[in-house]
């Protein structure tokens, strides 16, 4: 968050909406109010400048609020109550994309910053959505962990579908 491109130690206090961060560059401390009680934190590099932006998803309204590191705020409606935010770079443009997993129907709704809307059916209502670049191609992949079986289901962007047994059922 301090513009040196290294990860900073940070916590968010939901009761007050304050982000507390310890700067990796100089050990300094920042306290910035951004968000409200009930929000879910969704940090990422939404503007592609290489610096993490503070961001929250407000499930009650389906709105995303992004405090851009270079200044300014982005507000975007995307999602609904009950959705789980799964922000990541799904289109490989080095910008975090707004995305939600909807447990009620197992759909992933992804708004790619260059690719637009993508909808993917992948998961069950009891699955835990997971993002990551599981095939190392620079594009985020969609995956779910199924607690009832301890199995990971991964739909990689270039490597295709695979499963992995890792975890306790």
Each model region followed by its residue ranges:
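Trp/Gly-enriched beta-strand/coil motifs that build multi-repeat beta-propeller-like domains
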Residues: 1-169
């Amino acid at each position: 968050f301090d513009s040196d491109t290294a990860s900073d130690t940070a916590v968010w206090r939901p009761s007050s909406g304050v982000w507390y961060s310890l700067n990796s560059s100089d050990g300094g401390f920042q306290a910035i109010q951004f968000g409200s009680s009930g929000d879910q934190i969704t940090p990422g590099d939404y503007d592609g400048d290489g610096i993490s932006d503070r961001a929250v998803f407000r499930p009650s309204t389906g709105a995303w609020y992004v405090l851009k590191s270079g200044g300014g705020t982005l507000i975007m409606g995307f999602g609904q109550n009950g959705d789980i935010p799964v922000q990541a770079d799904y289109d490989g443009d080095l910008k975090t994309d707004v995305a939600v997993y909807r447990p009620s129907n197992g759909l992933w709704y992804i708004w790619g910053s260059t690719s637009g809307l993508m909808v993917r059916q992948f998961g069950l209502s009891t699955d835990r959505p997971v993002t990551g670049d599981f095939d190392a191609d620079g594009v985020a992949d969609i995956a779910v962990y199924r607690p009832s079986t301890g199995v990971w289901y991964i739909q990689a962007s270039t490597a295709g579908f695979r499963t992995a047994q890792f975890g306790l059922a």
